[in-house]
């Protein structure tokens, strides 16, 4: 992932500023370990300098916990003097922010060492290292995300979220009503602005569907033949959705499980692989007989326990699991089966792909993709067989065997020899240190339920 030539960069900046003389500011964006977008806001007059020389940001940006505090045990904070690295623009990510009252653009960045090589702890680079292994095989990954979220009221009830009132009916939704078109109409202005904003920003969002809970929706991204770009789109789509919803006097949550007893938010990813001739190596009239497909699935299933910390990176992530919510809890696969971890849609022989259905919407897309592709590559190179596909309800046929809490998931990741071949062990150490720090803080907190149960009872 080399830095593009200076002339190419400046041409992009010049063309954009010429086309958009109204733009006053530019937000320089970079996604941290948690997928939280951070960065700087500059005046338009400084944009050329950013393209020419980059901007400095501390390496500790990739050692932040979910609250934005540096986790010193990572070694990226005070141990190195909280030193800067340099961030360069990612080509073709300069665009307008349609929600801003003062005309503002945005530009996605990636971090490098001062000498120019990519910084190992940038999640985008973590993914790039895995993608290079497919490049060496002459293979191209096609990928697309499905992103679930809740619209919520800007006013909480006793610190808990609640569905927003419909701008159309004035009522709060209370039923599931999956795929109900009328529920799309209840929030039509907000949802249409999301799709139109995505189009303006070049994000290939092609559909919104009503999901399985009150005011829960899913945006589908179209597949692209670049898994890093697919993750860029997912990160930027989350930011777009949050800001468009706020413009409509609502909030949004991508929390994995915001409501007890309701469906959680997932982040499913669809993956196919093209050979040098651009043909899908998974294409088959009979997917069970396609060796490449079987081996890819076999590798993903074998590494799934080690993927879990990246797929479900927060304490709340594990509250999402349950048969009634279509969240798989064992490493299994099936043909057109939504109860399994790896579903193979069977609509078209040319479009055969794997759908990875485990991750929550709170996952960092780059790390999610890196861990899944690590499994795919592991399976292809070692010809790992996945076993027979599950028919019917997998929850009745397979006991839960995936890690069901963050601590166990971190242990699986830390102990995985396979994952360490694909993701720099130094990065795994940093990730585990950050998540263990969050976990320790969580475990030392006292919940409202504990006070309700024990304060006056024991």
Please place each PLM-identified region on the residue numbering.
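Flexible loop/turn segments at secondary-structure boundaries
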Residues: 33-38, 115-116, 151, 215, ...
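Short, contiguous, pocket-lining structural segments
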Residues: 182-190, 207-213, 226-237, 241, ...
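Catalytic-core signal marking the mid-to-C-terminal active-site face
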Residues: 2-3, 8-11, 240-243, 250-251, ...
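ATP/Mg2+-dependent ligation/transfer catalytic cores
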Residues: 1-210, 229-233, 398-458
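Short, solvent-exposed loop/turn segments at the edges of secondary structure
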Residues: 102-104, 144, 212-214, 264-268, ...
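Short, hydrophobic beta-strand segments
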Residues: 107-113, 217-224, 271, 356
């Amino acid at each position: 992932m080399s830095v593009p030539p200076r002339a190419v960069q400046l041409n992009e900046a010049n063309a954009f500023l010429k086309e958009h003389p109204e733009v006053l500011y530019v937000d320089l964006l970079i996604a941290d370990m948690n997928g939280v977008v951070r960065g700087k806001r500059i005046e338009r007059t400084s944009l050329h300098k950013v393209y020419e020389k980059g901007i400095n940001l501390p390496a500790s940006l990739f050692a932040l916990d979910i609250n934005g505090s540096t986790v010193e045990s990572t070694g990226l904070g005070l141990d190195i003097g909280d030193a800067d690295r340099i961030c360069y623009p990612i080509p073709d990510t300069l665009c307008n922010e349609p929600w801003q009252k003062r005309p503002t653009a945005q530009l996605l960045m990636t971090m490098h060492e001062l000498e120019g090589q990519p910084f190992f702890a940038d999640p985008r680079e973590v993914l790039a290292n895995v993608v290079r292994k497919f490049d060496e095989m002459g293979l191209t990954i096609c990928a697309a995300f499905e992103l679930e979220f809740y619209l919520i009221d800007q006013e909480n009830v006793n610190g808990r979220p609640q569905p927003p009132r419909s701008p159309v009916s004035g009522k709060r939704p209370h039923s599931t009503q999956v795929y109900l078109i009328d529920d799309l109409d209840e929030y039509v202005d907000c949802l249409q602005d999301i799709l139109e904003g995505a189009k303006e920003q070049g994000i290939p969002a092609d559909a919104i569907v009503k999901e399985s809970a009150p005011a829960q929706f899913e945006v589908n991204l179209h597949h692209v033949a670049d898994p890093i770009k697919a993750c860029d789109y997912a990160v930027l789509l989350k930011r777009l959705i949050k800001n468009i919803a706020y413009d409509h006097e609502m909030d949004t949550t991508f929390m994995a499980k915001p409501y007890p007893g309701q469906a959680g938010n997932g982040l499913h990813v669809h993956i196919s692989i093209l050979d040098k001739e651009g043909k899908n190596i998974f294409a088959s009239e009979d997917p069970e007989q396609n060796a490449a497909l079987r081996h890819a699935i076999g590798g993903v299933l074998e590494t799934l326990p080690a993927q879990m910390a990246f797929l479900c990176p927060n304490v709340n992530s594990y509250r999402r699991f349950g048969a009634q919510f279509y969240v798989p809890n064992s490493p299994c696969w099936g043909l057109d089966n939504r109860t399994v971890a790896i579903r193979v849609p069977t609509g078209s022989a040319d479009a055969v792909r794997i759908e990875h259905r485990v991750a929550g919407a709170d996952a960092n897309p780059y790390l999610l993709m890196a861990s899944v592709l690590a499994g795919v590559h592991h399976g292809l190179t070692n010809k790992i067989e996945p076993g027979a596909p599950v028919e019917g309800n997998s929850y009745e046929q397979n006991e839960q065997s995936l890690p069901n809490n963050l601590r166990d998931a971190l242990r699986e990741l830390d102990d995985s020899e396979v994952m360490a071949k694909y993701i720099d062990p130094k990065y795994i150490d940093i990730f585990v240190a950050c998540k263990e720090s969050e976990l320790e803080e969580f475990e030392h907190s006292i919940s409202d339920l504990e006070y309700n149960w024990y304060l006056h009872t024991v």
